[in-house]
Amino acid sequence: MKQFLLDEDRIPFSEGDTIMQAARRAGKYVPHLCWHPDLGQSGACRVCVVKADDRLVAACTTQVCENMRVENRSTELDDKRRLLLQMLFVEGNHFCPGCEKSGDCQLQATAAEMGMLDLHYEEFYPDRPVDASHADIWIDFDRCILCKLCVRASHEIDKKGVFAIGGYGIKTHLLINSSTGKLDKSDLSADDAAAHICPVGAILPKRVGFLHPIGMRKFDITPIAFETPGADDAID
């Protein structure tokens, strides 16, 4: 079987594999927020940046080739990831102690793995609406990191197209495909993949807030880098 080098470890891969796919199959953690094994490629967050043959690339969109040398967990790359995470934190409302997703949040867990101890940048303090119109699901747009997972899940898995992305630059935002732009008039169901795939606390089910006590939450038990490959990507 063909192999490539990932942080000096020889990793087997199949034809057409991306660096992310081959690494995850081999049990190697590549930090990510917008990648999911059940969805197509996106490259939206760039947290999975690696150095392949001395070029910076996204691990989730770059196909691996034989004898490629990939650098993943280096001080340089983790520093770049930490800067990206800090920008995501200050752009939205990510006050972890007050968020129901705390302890189960992929953004929070990845920041901890990258050694993020402060925000570094000045906070934006956005004032975006909360949509609680749906009977079972609510959205806090201030927490959305524009990973597009809900958009892609709704299109690719649910076949509904409930979500989309609109606007440009700092005004880029999540859209709801309904006559009113509200969730209650959309085709979203509580059991849709799009309703449960959010890696942060932007899309959450109602009536189950703070279900798990501190110490018993997902990433309290197992740090994100030590989970079984794909476990942190499971759709609940």
Where are these regions (language model features)?
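N-terminal cofactor/phosphate-binding cores enriched in small/glycine residues
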Residues: 11-66, 80
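Fe-S ferredoxin-like electron-transfer domains
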Residues: 46-47, 55-236
